[in-house]
């Protein structure tokens, strides 16, 4: 017995909707799995950045005399009357430059040094 043309079309629509539902279920599962999964490459990058930050902090502590090896605090130098910006405004590289040269640059000179350092940085677009 032949089926009515409407029944054929209904069966095709039903089959198509079942396929679409199974496909959509698979598609919704994949993004969730991708979000949950962290790749080894990403972890390697995170660990590398963490180690770099840790080295930077250790270097800064060593320069300031606060490393774990030396428990004796550094004596503070007598004030010479020069103006020194707060440490929060200085980058670690700028602090290294200041301590390695042994002098305390004036405010204008600090701004110039910051501008030079930031212009060389890949992370800072510039002043």
Curated annotation (Swiss-Prot):
Top-rank taxon: Eukaryota
Biased composition (Polar residues): 16-26, 67-79, 113-127
InterPro entries to which the protein is assigned, alphabetical: DUF4681 (IPR031465)
Alphabetical list of Pfam families matching this protein: DUF4681
Region (Disordered): 1-34, 64-127
Protein name in the entry: Uncharacterized protein C12orf54
Origin species: Homo sapiens
Organism ancestry: Eukaryota, Metazoa, Chordata, Craniata, Vertebrata
